[in-house]
Amino acid sequence: MNGRDMMPACARIAAADPAMADRMWNTTTDDDGRDLVDERMRGKGRMLCAACPMRLDCISRALVNGWKDKAVYGGLEYASRWTLARLIARDLHIADGGLHRIPRSRVRDWLAEHPDWAERMRRDGRDYWRRAKRRQRSRREYATDDPLFLPTEPVPKGLVQGSLF
């Protein structure tokens, strides 16, 4: 086995076609200077990351270094990395933003010890947003619907509704 076989797919693609690698794992800039994301190519990049043997290394490096950009590392975008970082920090009993204080190998070992981390991450992200929405709804002021009692005049005695025709 030579060194080329050990090279991850993202590095091989970046060496052959850097523009394609940017579209798969990073952003491209249009003429106006805005960052563009090619979702179709990102999907292909995520598929390559899912099969990559170095995926846990990429994820642990991104989590410990705290990269806050629009790039994809190990198949995860920033929001997913943030959710995973919270999950790992809670499990390791450190502050949410404290992953940069621990060795990268410890984060990688945690990922290797918990092969169900992707499902736990999805569940944790879903639960987080559920709690946030409940908190938001609990703070909302609701208008109470008071019954509408309009002032009325008493009916005169002896008056009966007549026929219309």
Descriptions of predicted regions:
Residues 1-9, 14-53, 64-68:
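Immediate flanking context of iron-sulfur cluster ligation sites
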Residues 5, 10-13, 74-109:
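Short Fe-S-cluster ligation motifs
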Residues 8, 71, 162:
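A broad, low-specificity signal marking well-ordered, structured residues that form hydrophobic/aromatic
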Residues 35, 74, 124-128:
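Helix-centric, low-specificity signal for extended rod-like, repetitive segments
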Residues 44, 55-73, 78-82:
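Iron-sulfur (Fe-S) cluster-binding segments and ferredoxin-like electron-carrier domains
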Residues 88-165:
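Short flanking/linker segments adjacent to small metal-binding domains or redox-active Cys/His motifs
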